[in-house]
């Protein structure tokens, strides 16, 4: 699944596939699904006004965004150079736009075989 966004007047493609959780673990040494759940819970708390902003790990947002871009374009350099190539980068806005893409890996798509 892919999505193209315009960031800092550049078109950037983001992609999630079956290997996204594995790449995330290899790149950042953290569990993709655990981080997605953590962020989802933090965002729910923000919406209800009960969030403790000091407990939200904003690095996770940046890491997931970078990984989805790197999955779409293998030529992207390291995370520091990539983010540094933008004059500005609205992390939370971009993250919001990519939620459907991220959640695609968490939805059940395997159908159970029917018994004869």
Question: Each predicted region: which residue ranges?
Answer:
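Charged interaction scaffolds used for protein-protein
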Residues: 1-11, 31-53, 59, 71-116
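Short, surface-exposed, low-complexity cationic segments
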Residues: 18-37
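Short low-complexity stretches enriched in small and charged residues
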Residues: 21-22, 54-56
């Amino acid at each position: 699944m892919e999505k193209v966004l315009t960031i800092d007047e550049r078109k950037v493609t983001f992609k999630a596939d079956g290997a996204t959780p594995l790449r995330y673990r290899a790149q950042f040494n953290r569990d993709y699904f655990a981080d997605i759940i953590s962020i989802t819970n933090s965002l729910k708390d923000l919406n209800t006004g009960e969030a403790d902003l000091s407990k939200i790990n904003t690095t996770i947002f940046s890491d997931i965004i970078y990984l989805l871009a790197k999955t779409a374009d293998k030529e992207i350099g390291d995370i520091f150079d990539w983010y540094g190539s933008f004059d500005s980068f609205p992390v939370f806005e971009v993250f919001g736009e990519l939620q459907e893409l991220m959640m695609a890996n968490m939805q059940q798509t395997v159908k159970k075989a029917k018994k004869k």
